[in-house]
UniProtKB/Swiss-Prot annotation:
Record protein name field: Chaperonin GroEL
One Gene Ontology cellular component annotation held by this UniProt entry: cytoplasm
Chief localization: cytoplasm
Places the protein is found: Cytoplasm
BP GO annotations: protein refolding
Family: Belongs to the chaperonin (HSP60) family.
Role of this protein: Together with its co-chaperonin GroES, plays an essential role in assisting protein folding. The GroEL-GroES system forms a nano-cage that allows encapsulation of the non-native substrate proteins and provides a physical environment optimized to promote and accelerate protein folding.
CDD domains associated with the record: GroEL
Originating species: Buchnera aphidicola subsp. Baizongia pistaciae (strain Bp)
Length: 550
């Protein structure tokens, strides 16, 4: 076991604080409409430029191990805020820095660290409750556009694109961000249910000019099994041929004789048919087949339910207005499923999302939810260079997370005003002793930090502006972009309540732990001289051997 370096008390806290300040100072220059960029060097390729707090935080690793521990703990604040709300990482880092700095001053002055932490926690609990009271719903496209614009660094085009995407696919719809091929940002909307499985044979293609299969008003056969024997399919093929409608087969796999027969029937025009593999794997495949069956009002032919393919009838088949298949994807448009059944399935998936523990499971459940809800929107980001593309894509993703958070929990006045107003409202709370009261005051002072930093980054005097804002009421605040005072809601400067709440909660949690730290332990650095001495010994022996041979 490696020898350890141990530091206690003030010596440990000073080192830790230095690390906190290095990371936070690098992150906070990005805050606000006039925040600056940070250039990040990469071990390969061109440097990247970002205005995203968590991206800056993730790159910072300090040489001094004790300082690095402080930096890593604040990095955790940014990461947690990012995971919870997808935005607000710079605000969270700034709040943590403010609480740690003020808190450690109080500890140095002789206050009890545990009581300080209790006071901070008490203030934060009250502040979160006040934020919820202050919050207003974010229901209309205008508010969504404003939230997206602010989070995308005052890029109105991005804000309106996100609002447009939410209008088209719904609040629960899947909206993804991709790198575009041109200079302009674009929105592409895929209506209906789309999954990542293409046609099993190119011979099914009936639109050769575009290389796709298009089926109008088709029947849809869903089977949770491999199909290789054509005899299993003959009864249903004959019934579909008599109806004159096309047929889409979705199964675990379809191969050999069965696939060959379908191709021949399709090419001869006996029955217009296409086949694709079912999406997903294992239990997820079963669930997605069930989703498709509810959307199209059909049944999944499953041997687990003692159902046989040979005995299936037209009543077991789903139906849709249109199906489009290319080599990679299948899109089912206008399924005839009953709205009540679809809504019940959506509610069931929402419940599963709440109970899911892994991010991967939540992501896959959200995809299923969106496909049932109405569609998928793709935001294609345009830029002139790859460096600009990466920076812009990160901003658009932040804006998308912020708008989702706003829809979920509502919005509060932006620009740091919400926390200033909350601090004023809870200024009369008291702790059980004087040390707790100091902790409460530490938290209240820290809540002014985001406003002060926004003002500082815009080149104005933080104390003057902060006092002017504190003298006002309600939504009155400072618009750093235009250097004027007024109603922040009217200015369109809004923050999602969830983002502000998460930033405050995570910052106070980690900062409280740092304030109560009394000892820090890390590995001692290896003695480079001894390493050099050890490595030179074999080399010298080898040389001696060579001399003897000569």
């Amino acid at each position: 076991m490696a020898a350890k370096d141990v530091k206690f008390g003030n010596e440990a806290r000073v080192k830790m604080l230095r690390g906190v300040n290095v990371l936070a100072d690098a992150v906070k220059v990005t805050l606000g409409p006039k925040g600056r960029n940070v250039v990040l060097d990469k071990s390969f390729g061109a440097p990247s430029i970002t205005k995203d707090g968590v991206s800056v935080a993730r790159e910072i690793e300090l040489e001094d191990k004790f300082e690095n521990m402080g930096a890593q703990m604040v990095k955790e604040v940014a990461s947690k805020a990012n995971d919870a709300a997808g935005d607000g990482t710079t605000t969270a880092t700034l709040l943590a820095q403010a609480i740690v700095n003020e808190g450690l001053k109080a500890v140095a002055a002789g206050m009890n660290p545990m009581d300080l932490k209790r006071g901070i926690d008490k203030a934060v609990i009250s502040a979160v409750e006040e934020l919820r009271i202050m919050s207003v719903p974010c229901a209309d496209s205008k508010a969504i556009t404003q939230v997206g614009t602010i989070s995308a660094n005052a890029d109105e085009k991005v804000g309106s694109l996100i609002a447009d995407a939410m209008d088209k696919v719904g609040k629960d719809g899947v909206i993804t961000v991709e790198e575009g091929t041109g200079l302009q940002d674009e929105l592409e909307v895929v209506k209906g249910m789309q999954f990542d499985r293409g046609y099993l044979s190119p011979y099914f293609i009936n639109k050769p000019e575009t290389g796709i299969v298009e089926l109008e008003n088709p029947y849809i056969l869903m089977a949770d099994k491999k199909i290789s024997n054509v005899r299993e399919l003959l009864p249903i093929l004959e019934a579909v041929a008599k109806s004159g409608k096309p047929l889409l087969i979705i199964s675990e796999d379809l191969e050999g004789e069965a696939l060959a027969t379908l191709v021949v029937n399709s090419m001869r025009g006996i029955v217009k048919v296409a086949a694709v593999k079912a999406p997903g794997f294992g239990d997820r495949r079963k669930a997605m087949l069930q989703d498709i069956s509810i959307l199209t009002s059909g049944s999944v032919i499953s041997e687990e339910l003692a159902m046989e393919l040979e005995k299936s009838t037209l009543e077991d088949l789903g139906q849709a207005k249109r199906v489009v298949i290319n080599k990679d994807t299948t899109t089912i448009i206008g399924g005839i499923g009953e709205k009540y059944n679809i809504q019940s399935r959506i509610s069931q998936i929402r419940q599963q999302i709440q109970e899911a523990t892994s991010d991967y499971d939540k992501e896959k459940l959200n995809e299923r939810l969106a496909k049932l809800s109405g569609g998928v929107a793709v935001l294609k980001v345009g830029a002139a260079t790859e460096v600009e593309m990466k920076e812009k894509k990160a901003r658009v993703e932040d804006a998308l997370h912020a708008t989702r958070a706003a829809v979920e929990e509502g919005v509060v006045p932006g620009g740091g005003v919400a926390l200033v107003r909350v601090a004023a409202k809870i200024s009369n709370i008291v702790g059980q002793n004087e040390d707790q009261n100091v902790g409460i005051r530490v938290a209240l002072r820290a809540m002014e930090a985001p406003l002060r930093q926004i003002v500082s980054n815009s080149g104005e005097e933080p104390s003057v502006v902060t006092n002017n804002v504190k003298d006002g009421k309600g939504n009155y605040g400072y618009n750093a972009a235009t250097d004027e005072y007024g109603d922040m809601i009217s200015f369109g400067i809004l923050d999602p309540t969830k983002v502000t709440r998460s930033a405050l909660q995570y910052a106070s949690s980690v900062a409280g732990l740092m304030i109560t730290t009394e000892c820090m332990v890390t590995d001692l650095p290896k003695d480079e001289k001894s390493d050099l001495g050890n490595s030179s010994a074999p080399s010298a022996g080898g040389m001696g051997g060579m001399g003897g041979m000569m």
